[in-house]
């Protein structure tokens, strides 16, 4: 359990509570969660050690046009890691549902409304794309880059989060490589529901021991924290224990409630080259 799981900022969230589903547009449904909650726990100061975005894919986005004909789209939302707040996912889902029976004059109006409301909730300008379903016709399903570290013949008996599993993980050889794992699993901070993901780690520096890295990632299995917070924890732990010269951590989580969340944190750039979904998404 995270140190801030009982924070007063979390007490008013709709997450984990019986909820009425509105079908008329209502921006007040969005609920922010201060990023400072876990960043204080990670001892991050005002100057963040990373760039990044939280990339959301909206698979259940629908509204009515001016004549009442339903429209459907896929949305992509880029929330800067520098924003004061992350957006709580159930409130995001409820907010999107409120578009379902609301008339909008154009697709552009929908995109503008989403941008305005999500930016207000996050506390910083958010980038929004509203794309027709056909936009994705030729987009491939991808896998993560680099070498998968999952097929190791090791025994694991503990699933409690332990950052110290990375102690001594930095070797003597200097490398530049990309590793990934599909075994990332944590639990929702509020509901304890499982969150399933894959994580890609791109770095330059002392070679990281793959067994220690895999044991560390598996230790998230019973850990309660939001997606974005887990990725920032992975980033800061790798910087602390392995001290790479360059580091990028990119996780892609399976969707829930028509949304997937893909946090990206890097010393090098603020977003990935593309936002292509994986087989489990």
UniProtKB/Swiss-Prot annotation:
Compartments, record wording: Cytoplasm
Q: What would be an example GO MF term here?
A: preQ1 synthase activity
User: Which Gene3D superfamilies does its entry note?
Assistant: 3.30.1130.10
Quote the EC number: 1.7.1.13
Residues that, per the record, bind substrate? 87-89, 227-228
Under which pathway is this protein filed? Answer: tRNA modification; tRNA-queuosine biosynthesis
SUPFAM superfamilies given for it?
Answer: Tetrahydrobiopterin biosynthesis enzymes-like
- Return the Pfam families for the record: QueF, QueF_N
GO CC annotation terms, alphabetical: cytoplasm
Give the family from UniProt.
Belongs to the GTP cyclohydrolase I family. QueF type 2 subfamily.
Relate the assembly described in the record: Homodimer.
Q: What's this protein's name? A: NADPH-dependent 7-cyano-7-deazaguanine reductase
